[in-house]
Amino acid sequence: DVLQVQSDYSNTFNWGGKKHAVLTGVDYYDDDAKRNQNYANTTPRPTTTVGTPDNGVGVADGRAPVQWNTFQARNVGLYFQDTISLTDTLKLVAGLRYDDFKASYRNPNGSLSSDRSDSLFSPRAGLIFQPDALSSYYLSYGTSYNTSGDTYQFSPGLSNSTARSANTPAEKSRNIEIGGKFELFERRALLGVAAFYSEKYNERNTDPDTAAQQELLSGKRHAAGMEFNLAGRMTPKWEVFFNHTWIPDAKIDQSNVARNSTGTGAQVQGDRPGLTPKHSGSFWSTYAVTSSVRVGAGLTYRGKQNPEGQRSYYASGFSTVDAMVEYAFDEKTSLKLNVSNLFDRVYADALYRGFYTPGAARSVQVTLKTRF
């Protein structure tokens, strides 16, 4: 069960001879979950003779009863941000977020196996330069945390009682970004270009000396690249939506994970992190052929990548094509045909260490829409 509540307050005022735009608020998150462990049947399988299946031979169910591990977490967040107009063209952005996080884990017997409590501050700052009404440039710096008290970091396999990850402080990340936004084609379209450098430090790694009991905040990784976004009307009849992420540089800078003798296993220091393709993005475009007929097509693409935690496997890059045609009977009623994955491409959508989830096959959808 998940409960989430958020409340914001914003206002603008003049103080100290400067204009201030303030955003502040509070959010609350409560998560109550259960996780069970999978137990295989340990009873030996008897032999039987082909052609005589009904000979009384059976297999007893030797699986252990399901054991539930309970996870409970609560987080209260407070945040404040002020955008100060230093001049008519230059703005300073400064903000701070505070999180109070608590989590507990209980084993199948109901006793407390582990708990975690963190008080975290996340500052951010930036500059915005707007030389005219059609363009703006920005520089930003921000930090964030990834607490070790979450359901998927719970390690029930350790005697069903010890969550080693829960005893590890939060991971930290920081991001630096510089970019610009530009209004084009008589303000019908918006172009965004940004360069970024993201770094995760204090990354969780298994302690090689006490691997069964502890994890260390000894890892570090980074990624650097650029993002491109374009959305809007190139002409009154032609719409384009495009985004592309290019990450030429990504590396695990520090790790105590050792490369095994066969060169397989988890990524090690110097490797490119998993789930980090060099190129990914999408493109979609529509064109009004007549006042009643509109056609569209686009593609989604992603480059080659490894799953997280496995350096010897990878999924090849792929692209899928979508298409659309729409007919408007009048201003209120329209009929639209969408075809997703037009060429029925087989690809790996989600990657894991031992398997992958295939992407959706070709699908056709017809939508009749009317307004009253």
Label each PLM-derived region with a short phrase.
Residues 19-23, 27-29, 69-200, 233-235, ...:
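Structural signature of Gram-negative outer-membrane beta-barrels, strongest in the C-terminal barrel
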Residues 35-67, 114-115, 157-166, 210-217, ...:
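Surface-exposed loop/turn segments flanking beta-strands in extracellular/periplasmic regions
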